[in-house]
């Protein structure tokens, strides 16, 4: 098969220490990449690259299954999931498996089944990966032209894009079917403190759903992260799945327009950079969602959000001091503002103290106490239920903040209490991974553009400064 790049471009990359270490079609001389450059050696070997991707999928699914079973084996039903460092079981619980009213786990068998199914799937993928990496054809173009490709073939590339979009659309509809047909999903807003329910009346209004995209990302607006009812979330997945599937069909049936052929770089490394950029965006959005959103990520499973823990603390002390005789409506704090209650910039009654910064929090345990103008004083005096007190005290002591002292007015625990919220883990990991993916996007985009423009040189090894330096030994 014709090599798409001049091999001279790659000779600056690295020199093998062991010149005898050669795999046909995968050594430095034929590919221009040394062994440590990984899949770059397979740029023009579609069969072997397929093996690498299938094996990688097998590793991912194996982790999911093994970690799932590990969490099931360590799970203690009497403790909340977020106290046990779990990150997979909360996702399964959110999908409505094994939980009942209030997010209580009533059956762990579905979690076990999930783990075993993923392990079995990973074995199939692992076998496929090994087969295509070692035994299958090196290139697919001759034997299986439908699965073969040339990176420069714009029409084939958009067809592959279309297939991917259809698969993403099907994935989106799987959530819709789970919520609508197969038992429903967990709704933290269900009356009485959350329950599993079928989502039958989902929102399909484009003005509501696309309105989220047009909202400001700041404050109480919160862009798409501000979604707070499952009808909107499932309706959004109906729209998203439909757009992905229709877009996929469009990309399969059409060829790229002239402006797209001119504007985009059409090479393997360019596609890698586009993909990394998309994944970086996904990572940053997921970070914000798991940190701020308590509807898609219910606090019963993931622990409270930062604002939620802070508001829960203010509520807990309001309840305590009100019982001790404080007049919470008029008590003044050290700054002259209300100690327990004050007014927001737009006039609503909100909690006073440092938690004022989180006044736009919405949480299922707090909303019943609001009236048309914010917190309702008469409800705070007469209508607080024991479950609201219990939940706020629990959330107050489980803030997703890794600190030894008070942060934002929230009392965090001493170091002996070994607690890190899954929200902290998931938000931090997705931000860091998203950032690295973004750097990778910039790196590969720069290389792809340079290669397309024909000026990528690399380091000239003949005049490298280290060659003129004294040997270390």
Curated annotation (Swiss-Prot):
One of its GO terms (cellular component) is photosystem II. The modification Phosphothreonine is found at residue 15. PSII is composed of 1 copy each of membrane proteins PsbA, PsbB, PsbC, PsbD, PsbE, PsbF, PsbH, PsbI, PsbJ, PsbK, PsbL, PsbM, PsbT, PsbX, PsbY, PsbZ, Psb30/Ycf12, at least 3 peripheral proteins of the oxygen-evolving complex and a large number of cofactors. It forms dimeric complexes. Belongs to the PsbB/PsbC family. PsbC subfamily. Keywords: Acetylation, Chlorophyll, Chloroplast, Chromophore, Manganese, Membrane, Metal-binding, Phosphoprotein, Photosynthesis, Photosystem II, Plastid, Thylakoid, Transmembrane, Transmembrane helix. One of the components of the core complex of photosystem II (PSII). It binds chlorophyll and helps catalyze the primary light-induced photochemical processes of PSII. PSII is a light-driven water:plastoquinone oxidoreductase, using light energy to abstract electrons from H(2)O, generating O(2) and a proton gradient subsequently used for ATP formation. It comes from Pisum sativum (Garden pea). The chain crosses the membrane at residues 69-93, 134-155, 178-200, 255-275, 291-312, 447-471. [CaMn4O5] cluster binds at residue 367. GO terms for biological process: photosynthetic electron transport in photosystem II. Residues 1-14 form a propeptide. This is Photosystem II CP43 reaction center protein. GO terms for molecular function: chlorophyll binding; electron transporter, transferring electrons within the cyclic electron transport pathway of photosynthesis activity; metal ion binding. The keyword Metal-binding applies. It is a multi-pass membrane protein. It holds the Pfam family PSII. The keyword Transmembrane helix applies. InterPro entries: PS_antenna-like, PS_II_antenna-like_sf, PSII_PsbC, PSII_PsbC_sf. It comes from the Eukaryota.
């Amino acid at each position: 098969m014709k090599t798409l790049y001049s091999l001279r471009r790659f000779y600056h990359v690295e020199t093998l220490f062991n010149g005898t270490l050669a795999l046909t079609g995968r050594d430095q001389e034929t590919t221009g990449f040394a062994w440590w450059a990984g899949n770059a050696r397979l740029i023009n070997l579609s069969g072997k690259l397929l093996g690498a991707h299938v094996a990688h999928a097998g590793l991912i699914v194996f982790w999911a299954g093994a970690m799932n079973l590990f969490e099931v084996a360590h799970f203690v039903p009497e403790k909340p999931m977020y106290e046990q460092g779990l990150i997979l079981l909360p996702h399964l619980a959110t999908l409505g498996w094994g939980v009942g009213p209030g997010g209580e786990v009533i059956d762990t068998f579905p979690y076990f089944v999930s783990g075993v199914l993923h392990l079995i799937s990973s074995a199939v993928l692992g076998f496929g990966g090994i087969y295509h990496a070692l035994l299958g054809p090196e290139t697919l173009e001759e034997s299986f032209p439908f699965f073969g490709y040339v990176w420069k073939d714009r029409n084939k590339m958009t067809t592959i894009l279309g297939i991917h979009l259809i698969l993403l659309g099907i994935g989106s509809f799987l959530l819709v079917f789970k919520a609508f047909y197969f038992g429903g999903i967990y709704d933290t807003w269900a009356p009485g403190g959350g329950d599993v329910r079928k989502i039958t009346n989902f929102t399909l209004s484009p003005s509501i759903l696309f309105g989220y995209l047009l909202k400001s990302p700041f404050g109480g607006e919160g862009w798409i992260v501000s979604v707070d009812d499952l009808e909107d979330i499932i309706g959004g997945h109906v729209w998203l799945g439909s757009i992905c599937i229709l877009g996929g069909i469009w990309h399969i049936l059409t060829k790229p327009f002239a402006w797209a052929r001119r504007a985009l770089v059409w090479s393997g490394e360019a596609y890698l950079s586009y993909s990394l950029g998309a994944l970086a965006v996904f990572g940053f959005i997921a970070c914000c969602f798991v940190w701020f959103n308590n509807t898609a990520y219910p606090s019963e499973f993931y622990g409270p959000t930062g604002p939620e823990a802070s508001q829960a603390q203010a509520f807990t002390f309001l309840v305590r001091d009100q019982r001790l005789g404080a007049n919470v409506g008029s008590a003044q704090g050290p700054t002259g503002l209300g100690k327990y209650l004050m007014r927001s910039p737009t006039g609503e009654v909100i909690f006073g103290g440092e938690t004022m910064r989180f006044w736009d929090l919405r949480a299922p345990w707090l909303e019943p106490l609001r009236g048309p103008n914010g917190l309702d004083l008469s409800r705070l005096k007469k209508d607080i239920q024991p479950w609201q007190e219990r939940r706020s005290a629990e959330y107050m002591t489980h803030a997703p903040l890794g600190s030894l002292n008070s942060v934002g007015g929230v009392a965090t625990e001493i170091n002996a209490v070994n607690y890190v919220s899954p929200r902290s883990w998931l938000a931090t990991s997705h931000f860091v991974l998203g950032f690295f993916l973004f750097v990778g996007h910039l790196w590969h985009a720069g290389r792809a553009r340079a290669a397309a423009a024909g000026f990528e040189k690399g380091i000239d090894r003949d005049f490298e400064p280290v060659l003129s330096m004294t040997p270390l030994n």
